[in-house]
Amino acid sequence: MTTTEKAKTLRKNATPWENKLWYEFFKSYPVKFRRQQPIGQYIVDFYCSKAKIIVEADGGGHFYDDKIEYDKERDLFLQSKGYKVLHFTNLEIDKNFYGVCTVIDRAVKESI
């Protein structure tokens, strides 16, 4: 499966937290975001080309040692390409959705 095909599958099988961010924030946000966007060998949850911002909705699997190391390597690659990477846990998205959206909005406004 190519990265593009995998991204398409991920879009069709989004987590509840990804769907919440997409349908309740990004879809109507005035600056365009894409979801499950391939960048190099990686697929990022949300991507804004204009602001060079990536937003990740991190589920429980991101807290195992191997995934922590993978995320660090991926973030370093993305940062080397000029992207700012924002990570939010599913719990943050559930319990502080307004705060998460505010952080994203500020980051976009600072970047464009």
List where the protein language model places each region.
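Nucleic-acid endo/exonuclease domains
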Residues: 1-112
